[in-house]
């Protein structure tokens, strides 16, 4: 037969790199969930600010009445 077996030396495990060593502490908390609400309020604030940003862009692009009370010079 022509089959070959893979040598054990090629299975030495994962290589260590500088980037991997720098990023490993960021992955140490993987799978753990903070008790309570965590960062949910911050996500809500970020979503609200993003919605305001999108409505401003829509106002500039479409000249709609969504922000009719705000004057644009």
UniProtKB/Swiss-Prot annotation:
GO cellular component terms listed in the entry, alphabetical order = chloroplast thylakoid membrane; photosystem II
- An example of a Gene Ontology BP annotation on this entry? photosynthesis
In its record, the post-translational modification comment is:
Phosphorylation is a light-dependent reaction catalyzed by a membrane-bound kinase; phosphorylation occurs on Thr residue(s) in the N-terminus of the protein.
Provide the primary localization.
plastid
> Where is this gene product found?
Plastid, Chloroplast thylakoid membrane
PANTHER family xrefs: PHOTOSYSTEM II REACTION CENTER PROTEIN H (PTHR34469:SF4)
What's the protein here called? Photosystem II reaction center protein H
This chain is encoded by the gene named psbH
